[in-house]
Amino acid sequence: MSDLVITRPDDWHLHLRDGDALATTVPATARLFSRAIVMPNLVPPVTHTAQAEAYRHRILSHVPAGAAFDPLMTLYLTNNTSPEEIVAARQSGIVYGCKLYPAGATTNSDAGVTDVANVFSVLEKMSDMGMPLLIHGEVVQADVDIFDREKRFIDETLTPLTERFPNLKIVLEHITTRDAVEFVNQAGSNVGATITAHHLLYNRNHMLVGGIRPHFYCLPILKRSEHQLALRDAAASGSDRFFLGTDSAPHPKEKKEAACGCAGCFTAPSALELYAEAFDELGALDKLEGFASLHGPTFYGLPINSGKVRLSKQEWTMPASMALGDSSIVPFRAGETIRWKAELL
């Protein structure tokens, strides 16, 4: 198959950053995606509904003329988040989830939750109100190997959490392991997961063999090929428990190409095309529309988009760099061939 038309997709996990960066990040996503769940890990983090509303307005001010893009906002859970804030967020009509970052797990997560028990009253309110909990599922103890942190989180935190709150809607974000796939498959229908394009296409060998590739470095980190294969099987299975979430996470070039570089891959400029590449490799292009356009809205209880996108097997070259405020950014697969081309119909 060299040409297909799918329902316009959504991105259920996206970092847009703030300030001048929005001039680059917002158009990159609004090019093809109708909606996106916007991560709240700014500095300072988006912890209150009023902050989410202000951030949403800043994002909308950078949507290109004629484009239709709806940012779906989230709140950053802290030890001090109150059940009352959850009520306000739900009633706002613009907040669609709350993000649980174990403190120190990833970029700008220092204000995160230090012990999930600290937010049990908040999770109870979220469960009652149907507000999804979005989880970065890694433990943060220094003595736990970085490649084992997702499995340990599932065993030590997520499993007891789902037992305590059996009706809480949970998205285990950017899953990277066979363990996560098995957990989601065995959990109730209130548990789903997002999968990134880079975790479908690559494993840790691609990042480390023959030289360190800093633009492949992300958190959760790329894993062994056996875990990559499990993710590919899950995405191509047609299960509505798995859906598209790019985790596109931009950082300036100097913060990636450094002695201690930041985690995150800026995949937004070619995100849908990269997913098409992965599904094409799997012989599962017929499953792409469900994964990219149908499963996410169904999980969140939102309408399916009415627009369409055409994907054609047409090669093009990703630019070597792009402007990012006063700096520049190296997009994922910079200077390399992208095998599919997408356009909004």
Curated annotation (Swiss-Prot):
Look up the EC number in the record and give it.
3.5.2.3
**Classification via InterPro entries:** Amidohydro-rel, DHOdimr, Dihydroorotase_CS, Metal_Hydrolase
Residues forming the catalytic site: D247
Q: Which residues carry this modification: N6-carboxylysine?
A: K99
Catalytic activity, per the record?
Answer: (S)-dihydroorotate + H2O = N-carbamoyl-L-aspartate + H(+)
Please name the GO terms that the record assigns under molecular function: dihydroorotase activity; zinc ion binding
State where substrate binds. Answer: H15, L16, R17, N41, H136, L219, H251, A263
Main EC class the enzyme belongs to: hydrolase
Query: What GO terms describe the biological role, i.e. biological process, of this protein?
Result: 'de novo' pyrimidine nucleobase biosynthetic process; 'de novo' UMP biosynthetic process
- The answer, when asked if Transit peptide is one of the entry's keywords, is no
Where is Zn(2+) 2 bound in this sequence?
K99, H136, H174
According to the record, cofactor stoichiometry and binding are noted as:
Binds 2 Zn(2+) ions per subunit.
Subunit text: Homodimer.
Q: Which family does it belong to?
A: Belongs to the metallo-dependent hydrolases superfamily. DHOase family. Class II DHOase subfamily.
The protein in question is named Dihydroorotase
* Source organism of this protein record: Hahella chejuensis (strain KCTC 2396)
